[in-house]
Amino acid sequence: MNNSINHKFHHISRAEYQELLAVSRGDAVADYIIDNVSILDLINGGEISGPIVIKGRYIAGVGAEYADAPALQRIDARGATAVPGFIDAHLHIESSMMTPVTFETATLPRGLTTVICDPHEIVNVMGEAGFAWFARCAEQARQNQYLQVSSCVPALEGCDVNGASFTLEQMLAWRDHPQVTGLAEMMDYPGIISGQNALLDKLDAFRHLTLDGHCPGLGGKELNAYIAAGIENCHESYQLEEGRRKLQLGMSLMIREGSAARNLNALAPLINEFNSPQCMLCTDDRNPWEIAHEGHIDALIRRLIEQHNVPLHVAYRVASWSTARHFGLNHLGLLAPGKQADIVLLSDARKVTVQQVLVKGEPIDAQTLQAEESARLAQSAPPYGNTIDRQPVSASDFALQFTPGKRYRVIEVIHNELITHSRSSVYSENGFDRDDVCFIAVLERYGQRLAPACGLLGGFGLNEGALAATVSHDSHNIVVIGRSAEEMALAVNQVIQDGGGLCVVRNGQVQSHLPLPIAGLMSTDTAQSLAEQIDALKAAARECGPLPDEPFIQMAFLSLPVIPALKLTSQGLFDGEKFAFTTLEVTE
């Protein structure tokens, strides 16, 4: 928890203080008073009755003593329960395939008033220009969009080709930006543990801010060393005892439930009254279809309450106050005097039914957000331009030669998890000894003209066809999986033609595709249109076999070398446990 930076974010002038205090004392008129409301007490449990009094961006007072206070406008909450605005502790907005402007339109009416975003997806493609665009979006947003400065671009040096670098000098230029809360996830945990100076330089430069971690499955002395370096949190835990040990060692735990990585069921039993200040909720990567149909952080709160019997005040605590404290955002996370008036009114607190949202003291209207979306997007000056520097491919580019009797490594997918297993399969004249083995390839898209890196994939469920995408963490090269080289080539050529995007091929034809014109990562369509297109893509993909719930998000992590156990980058097969490249053929 980093309270030393609170002054940076709590922008309030002396004149604003005087006006706020006058309303608190009852000597001046409030801007808004919310009547007929109960406030969920996140500290003690239970509820506080009485109005919420707002002046400007801030709460001037709470409680029955303000029942007769004057206001310019009164809001009748109709018996609703008021809770602080929800906070996502760690996400990559790009993974929603929405721009930050569209993301705000889709999630703010659901109560998501604050996000802590690491824009390392677009930074890996476009470098500092991508970070600058996210900062512009954050500056103009109604939603509190805070940024962690991307620390690992690329994710792991020398393991992949990406589109740009983001040097320490460039990082430092953004450190004091008003929307920056700290240093984003330090994914090269072996480098931190071994004391590599280049990585320690980054930690030292941001040590007065919040230092995000990334250490899936880490334990023992290595975990102790990683925490000793100053890392404060982790969102990659996927086992109960792993999460418990990190909490015991003083690390804050971000409980993640995204579209591919689903760790809430495994980790929710850890949450209790004692450790909840050290627990937070995050999505990491969540697609627009799930946001539209299930929700965002509101969906996670609902599951904590309904499926895991977490008390109301604890569930809402980990969705707001705990995260605000961790990042030094002490003006957020509570409905109390002097706090920013980010308020969610719930007609049903157990079902997280959002009735109305206020952010920075102003009611939010979903229709107004939608009507203003295109103008606000244009104002942010998105970095348009084709980022795909790759010539069309042919089936021969994916030709692999196998020798009967030999054993070959297979990337084994675990549905709804980002980790994979390293398996092997024996080849014979009739094919592999497992019928679920298909092909995977990664093609760099930044003009280096490398031959595709090819491998084998098991457990994905692809019985026919091919899927291709330019969303491929973290370097975002082209990843394609398929049953035939011809269909793989067709899918790849479609995303090249689109300037980036997603594609499904079956029966020798493109069944569905989605162009992503911003960095090959994001669409400029509305959230509703994007959700409909994702629905069509998923329907087409389901015709190819019993795939993961979110096949494109699951596929996007098959190239990320910092998550074990076996991955494929543009440079070849990578052993994520030994942190070294390995061969397709098993020779040991």
From Swiss-Prot:
PANTHER family: ADENINE DEAMINASE (PTHR11113:SF2), N-ACETYLGLUCOSAMINE-6-PHOSPHATE DEACETYLASE (PTHR11113)
Binding partners and assembly: Homodimer.
Phylogenetic classification of the source organism: Bacteria, Pseudomonadati, Pseudomonadota, Gammaproteobacteria, Enterobacterales
UniProt-recorded name of the protein: Adenine deaminase
CDD domains named among the record's database cross-references: AdeC (cd01295)
GO BP annotation list: adenine catabolic process
GO molecular function: adenine deaminase activity
Organism: Escherichia coli O6:H1 (strain CFT073 / ATCC 700928 / UPEC)
UniProt KW NAD keyword: no
Cited NCBIfam families: ade (TIGR01178), PRK10027.1 (NF007457)
Transmembrane segments: none
Protein family (similarity comment): Belongs to the metallo-dependent hydrolases superfamily. Adenine deaminase family.
E.C. no: 3.5.4.2
Keywords: Hydrolase, Manganese
Keyword Manganese listed: yes
Catalysis performed (reactions): adenine + H2O + H(+) = hypoxanthine + NH4(+)
